[in-house]
């Protein structure tokens, strides 16, 4: 069990390393609206990754609030530590959702359709990337957004292939696609 915990923390350390280096690169290589848009994009993505992680760790792993907090990336979140703490201490998934929806970032949950809670993070990422791809004036923001959209479309192709392979109903397959 300690091996599982340390493996999970290794994942957290890797994600912290990636996000801290990403933040350094953005701050050193960009300025103005480009910096603001890139930081906002990655911060919102991390906020929803933290949200999904809280839901998953509560539901499937029954971890304590302290263990859940150790698996989150606080420094790269626009959600306050106090709010993340409330999410970790929530008794049910519904309570986690309501705490998230109280935040500025959490308002996107109402705008996207999702079947499973794990769908929320990729759907938000796709929605933001599509918006940035069309409306940003900064080439780096458009490029990273395009990469996120391409990644999502590849996931959709895989979902279609697997759904067909396992003979799922077309309505079920359609509900799993991120559009």
Residue ranges of each PLM-predicted region?
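C-terminal structured domains
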Residues: 76-179
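Long, low-complexity, acidic Ser/Pro- and Gly-enriched intrinsically disordered regions
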Residues: 21, 25, 53-56, 70-71
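Solenoid-like repeat scaffolds
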Residues: 40-44, 75-77
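Short, flexible domain-boundary/linker segments around small modular repeats
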Residues: 15-38, 125-144
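Extracellular/lumenal glycan-associated surfaces
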Residues: 47-62, 155-167
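Single conserved hydrophobic/aromatic residue that forms the stacking wall/gate
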Residues: 2-13
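Extended, well-ordered protein cores
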Residues: 20, 44-47
């Amino acid at each position: 069990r300690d091996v599982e915990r340390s493996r999970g923390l290794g994942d957290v350390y890797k994600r912290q390393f990636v996000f801290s280096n990403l933040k350094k690169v953005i701050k050193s290589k960009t300025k103005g609206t480009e910096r603001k848009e890139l930081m906002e994009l990655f911060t919102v993505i991390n906020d929803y990754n933290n949200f999904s992680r809280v839901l998953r760790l509560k539901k499937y792993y029954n971890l304590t609030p302290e263990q859940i907090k150790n698996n989150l990336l606080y420094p790269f979140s626009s959600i306050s530590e106090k709010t993340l703490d409330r999410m970790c201490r929530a008794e049910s998934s519904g309570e986690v959702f309501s705490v998230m929806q109280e935040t500025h970032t959490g308002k996107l949950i109402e705008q996207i359709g999702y079947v499973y809670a794990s769908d929320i993070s990729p759907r938000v990422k796709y929605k933001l990337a599509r918006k940035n791809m069309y409306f940003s004036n900064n080439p780096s923001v458009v490029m990273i957004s395009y990469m996120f959209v391409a990644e999502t479309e590849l996931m959709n192709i895989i979902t279609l292939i697997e759904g067909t392979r396992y003979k799922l109903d077309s309505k079920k397959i359609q509900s799993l696609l991120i559009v």
